[in-house]
Design a protein with these regions (language model features):
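RNA pseudouridine synthases
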Residues: 1-2, 6-196
Length: 196
């Protein structure tokens, strides 16, 4: 992972496969463990004890930018910006098929799955409100391979697995996602490592 250090924040380009903080079955090799080791006490202590500097999170299987607060003032200001939605969170996802309509807004509730507590699911009435705005950037079609779409997703809320759940619920599962996929979706002659 790459890192940019400033007086009051760190900006980390997190790789896929790394958890933000320790949790069940994964107590080492997390962003928090690395921050504690390399930043020592130069992190904010606002919030939960075992999440120093952590203002927001992204899923373990997601790569992307994480902003980490080095002091309490920056932590509080960043938290307020996330709460007031003045920081844009934009992600790119490669999905199976053509997403219909090509752009739109997904608004519903997301809750823990009753079948598997490690997964989330869409609900019409229960859970936390979740809003994802999306637009198709490009469609990849060929007579000899499946159709894929590159989709830009802009979050208004930040729920666990939000993009994965929303796109999966539309029938456009993220390529390489092992948790929210249909069993018949296989990539022929392509190494799934390319999609991590």
């Amino acid at each position: 992972s790459e890192m940019c250090i400033r007086d009051s924040i760190l900006v980390l380009n997190k790789q896929s496969g790394i958890s933000i903080h320790p949790g069940a079955g994964n107590y080492d090799k997390t962003v928090v463990n690395a921050l504690i080791k390399y930043c020592n006490k130069n992190l904010s202590d606002v919030g939960e004890k075992y999440r120093p500097g952590i203002v927001h999170r992204i899923d373990k299987d997601t790569s992307g930018i994480i902003i980490i607060a080095k002091n309490n003032i920056s932590h509080l200001k960043l938290s307020e910006q996330f709460k007031n939605h003045t920081i844009d969170r934009v992600y790119l996802a490669l999905v199976w098929g053509k997403i219909r309509p090509r752009s739109g807004r997904i608004e519903n509730f997301i809750k823990r799955s009753v079948k598997n507590r490690q997964l989330m699911e869409v609900s019409l009435t229960k859970g936390k409100k979740a809003i994802t705005n999306y637009k198709t950037i490009e469609v990849f079609e060929s007579d000899k391979s499946p159709t894929f779409s590159l989709v830009e997703c802009k979050l208004e809320t930040g729920r666990t697995h939000q993009i994965r759940v929303h796109l999966s619920n539309k029938g456009n599962h993220i390529v390489g996602d092992k948790h929210y996929k249909k069993k018949f979706k296989k990539i022929t002659n392509v190494d799934e490592e390319l999609f991590k």
